[in-house]
From Swiss-Prot:
PFTA repeat spans: 87-120, 122-155, 180-213, 219-252, 295-328
UniProt cross-references to Pfam families, sorted A to Z: PPTA
Annotated stretches, region: Disordered: 263-282
An annotated Gene Ontology molecular function: protein prenyltransferase activity
Family the entry assigns: Belongs to the protein prenyltransferase subunit alpha family.
GO CC terms in record: cytoplasm; mitochondrion
Keywords of this entry: Acetylation, Prenyltransferase, Repeat, Transferase
Protein name from the UniProt record: Protein prenyltransferase alpha subunit repeat-containing protein 1
N-acetylalanine: residues bearing it: 2
Amino acid sequence: MAETSEEVAVLVQRVVKDITNAFRRNPHIDEIGLIPCPEARYNRSPIVLVENKLGVESWCVKFLLPYVHNKLLLYRTRKQWLNRDELIDVTCTLLLLNPDFTTAWNVRKELILSGTLNPIKDLHLGKLALTKFPKSPETWIHRRWVLQQLIQETSLPSFVTKGNLGTIPTERAQRLIQEEMEVCGEAAGRYPSNYNAWSHRIWVLQHLAKLDVKILLDELSSTKHWASMHVSDHSGFHYRQFLLKSLISQTVIDSSVMEQNPLRSEPALVPPKDEEAAVSTEEPRINLPHLLEEEVEFSTDLIDSYPGHETLWCHRRHIFYLQHHLNAGSQLSQAMEVDGLNDSSKQGYSQETKRLKRTPVPDSLGLEMEHRFIDQVLSTCRNVEQARFASAYRKWLVTLSQ
């Protein structure tokens, strides 16, 4: 075991080199982790590489982390010089152990801007860090910065024009979107209600996918099973609410464009060889009422199957809110603050009541069906929390219709 500063320096340099060599031997490493090992029992490297998994024996972290941390700070204060390769290796090791060290990410930003570091490699490093620290805010922030650099490259446009079909994601953009969705999904599975992961997923839809309708529909479909397996995950259900609201907003925008420019609805002349491609890229037609009805049925099944989960009742409020505005033909630019009335805050209650009264009166049929659903739940449930949430939902509906 190393004791003197010289021995620690030799040990750490060897470990950093072993980590670098591990990535060179296997560039497809997809997960990192700590191996519980209080002491160094054998005279061997504490870095273990098995297939695509990289492990670090825990005994060396107390030497490794302070050393690389101090080394980078000395570089930033111009008290010690590090060449580019050393910077890449030191920041890589540091971020795998502590991904919320902002200075290390900033150094790598400088390396990317100078052309020394491939931004794709930084996406991979961030993905690895998220397998151990799935909620790391600095990692998600840096990831968005890297993606912005990629989509801003003039030689790599994110979207291409397809005649009257508007713009669709390029193959490169589609690949990036798919990879980011996978990273977000893995992080959300590792940490419950991972707000940072779901927020990043929304950012990807807004900035990479440009709220493409087909991608929004695919996301709504692909996250349905996940939501049914994580019925207490507020962030996951908020994501579905974002998808539904975005689909409604995009449909409203498209309808308004069609009204202003009727020629847009005329079919474009497509060469025979491009007909198949045009069909495959044409935006699907959306039946919004049917889409929301399906979400109501999904909500009903979950509430019946998993009683006592507040997340499910909050989600149902949002669905009814969207149906309510869609049926009334109202714009969805208003804030969706429908998480309930806070009895302990009189001011909050007053503001919520005023906001709800500004909205159109909900259709009587939909409101009646919701009250029937609440009556059915209250008459059959034995769960105290379920009854409380159902009563709160009824109170919200009454306030909405006043």
